[in-house]
Amino acid sequence: MIRVIFLDLDKTLLPEYDPEPAIPIVEELKKKGFEIVFNSSKTRAEQEYYREKLNVKGPFIVENGSAIYIPSNYFPFEVPGVKRGEYMVLELGVKVEEIRKALKELEAEYGLKYYGNSTDEEIEKFTKLPKHLIPLAKDREYSETIFLWKREGWEKDLIRKGFKVTMGSRFYAVHGNSDKGKAAKLLLDLYKRVDEVESYAVGDGENDFPMFDVVDFAFLIGDLRHENAENVTSIKDVLKKI
């Protein structure tokens, strides 16, 4: 039996941006025998930073389900995808260049601010990111993050152009027709080729809802509600239940 847990990062595993408080959580999950899979709106570069700090080695899902990064030779069979460095990458989203082209057409009309048209100083102000993490957040491949807008309607225009707009813990994300659930299910199907699987997911935002629909046990931090998820106050509560 393989036990897999999908973890959102912001406001779920990470109270803020410091990985230190998450170390005992990750260690406890390892002791319980879990395969830990980050499933976050964060970029590959950001997730690699936290993977290193937290010593997490398995696959991870980036930018709201836009791509799955699987370490080479992780599964005992060939994984379909694009070879990129030490990973096989299963791409489910669209390239960020396509998204930014659409945003460029709308930014003047709606006063949009996002990574692609913001300075490092503006990004620091919007996100409260530590300076050393800003380049990692800017290294986007499949999505953009909307920080500010001056009037409503931009979401509908982007949806009409074929993109998805989802709400995370802090900001709206713009990406292709991908979500955390589609990516999680695809990865679970690969695990099931190895052995029986028991699956879990923990998140705190609306963009986590799709992954709650594809796992056996789901936990929702905070006051939102989802029919397939049990509400908890923090990830520490989850450790007591699994």
From Swiss-Prot:
GO biological process, one term: mannosylglycerate biosynthetic process
Places the protein is found: Cytoplasm
Active site: 8 (nucleophile)
Transmembrane feature ranges: none
Top-level division of the source organism's lineage: Archaea
Presence of keyword Magnesium: yes
Pathway info: Carbohydrate biosynthesis; 2-(alpha-D-mannosyl)-D-glycerate biosynthesis; 2-(alpha-D-mannosyl)-D-glycerate from GDP-alpha-D-mannose (MPG route): step 2/2
Catalytic activity: 2-O-(alpha-D-mannosyl)-3-phosphoglycerate + H2O = (2R)-2-O-(alpha-D-mannosyl)-glycerate + phosphate
Enzyme Commission numbers on file: 3.1.3.70
Pfam family, one: Hydrolase_3
Keywords, in A-Z order: Cytoplasm, Hydrolase, Magnesium, Metal-binding
CDD domains: HAD_Pase
Single GO MF annotation: mannosyl-3-phosphoglycerate phosphatase activity
A GO CC term assigned to this protein in UniProt: cytosol
Function: Hydrolyzes mannosyl-3-phosphoglycerate (MPG) to form the osmolyte mannosylglycerate (MG).
PANTHER family reported for this sequence: HAD SUPERFAMILY HYDROLASE-LIKE, TYPE 3, PHOSPHOSERINE PHOSPHATASE
Listed name of the protein: Mannosyl-3-phosphoglycerate phosphatase
Protein species of origin: Pyrococcus furiosus (strain ATCC 43587 / DSM 3638 / JCM 8422 / Vc1)
Gene behind the chain: mngB
